[in-house]
Amino acid sequence: MPWANRCLTSLRQSIVPCDITIIDNGSTDGTQDYIHNNFPEVDLIRNKENLGFGQANNIGLQKALDNNYEFVYLLNQDAWILEDTFKHLIDASEAHPEYGVLSPIQMKADGLHFEEKFGSYIIPHHQVFSPSLTEDLYFQRIEDVYEVSFVMAAHWLITSKCLAIVGGFSPTFSHYGEDNNYLNRTNYWNYKIGIVPSARAIHDRGDSKWSIEKEMYVNDYVGSLVSFSNPLRRESLDTKIIQLLKRGIRNRQMVLIKYALRLKKERCLADANYERTLKEKAFLK
């Protein structure tokens, strides 16, 4: 709830009007009542349980398709926009319809520095690095949009045409990896992913730090599922499982062995969901 006021007030102040839908994943901290009382214009959908990031978003994405919205903007609860964020993104989208997903420059809460994860994507040697963006930011010769292979889903503008083909988030991923998988599928359906440097927005992660075990979960367990579910260059899950088992035994890290066994158990579901991603409008009606 700490971010709700900042997030929703920023949407009210946008120079491009928008309809707001909030998917509440069974919160019990008073967020639902706060939104109902202070932001009555919001369509608040109350889930009885936490469905996870992807499946909660699918509820909103389905609503957007059913109501023929031209664009959908995914916004984290710990994030907010500037007055002109939507305008810059929509202008770029209309000028470059080959892009299915666009993101603004994502800043820390101070508005002066790149959000830490976002900043790492646009530095040299990172796998999604865009050298032209980095150089142009330095020399102040900015293009409308820069293509990247990944940008985190705290701020995404998705076009209705892209959504109608790519569909929703895969239930293979309950926490982390949903955005990687979605963007791989976006590329599979011949849509590009881009960053619009004229558009700025805030993602306030605070001072949260990842534990070593969380790093392993994201990089090893989730990363294996992302590779196995990538329709562009699918990798063997058996190979990933064997690698995790060997590392776990060699380094005496039981958590890696646990992840390997979990991957083996969930293989059938992940395989079935992969087949669904090869069809249009996957995971939506």
Where are these regions (language model features)?
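Short beta-strand-to-loop acidic/aromatic patch adjacent to the donor-nucleotide binding site
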Residues: 69-80
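Short, flexible, basic/aromatic active-site loop/helix in glycosyltransferases
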Residues: 122-148
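Glycine-rich, basic loop-to-helix element that forms the pyrophosphate-binding segment
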Residues: 47-67
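A short, conserved alpha-helix in the catalytic core of glycosyltransferases
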Residues: 149-158, 162-167, 172-200
